[in-house]
Swiss-Prot record:
Keyword tags: Electron transport, Membrane, Photosynthesis, Thylakoid, Transmembrane, Transmembrane helix, Transport
UniProt organism field: Mastigocladus laminosus (Fischerella sp.)
Gene name per UniProt: petN
Gene Ontology BP term (one): cytochrome complex assembly
GO CC terms: cytochrome b6f complex; plasma membrane-derived thylakoid membrane
UniProt-recorded name of the protein: Cytochrome b6-f complex subunit 8
Localization (cell): Cellular thylakoid membrane
Keyword Thylakoid tagged: yes
Function of the protein: Component of the cytochrome b6-f complex, which mediates electron transfer between photosystem II (PSII) and photosystem I (PSI), cyclic electron flow around PSI, and state transitions.
C-alpha cells in the first residue's frame, strides 16, 4: 500500500506541474 500511495503522490505532482506549465505558457509568463 505504501508504494501505491507514493505512486499516486508522484503522479499528482507530475500532473499538477504539467497543467501549471501549460497554463503559464498560455499566459505568456
Amino acid at each position: 500500500m505504501e508504494i501505491d500511495v507514493l505512486g499516486w503522490v508522484a503522479l499528482l505532482v507530475v500532473f499538477t506541474w504539467s497543467i501549471a506549465m501549460v497554463v503559464w505558457g498560455r499566459n505568456g509568463l
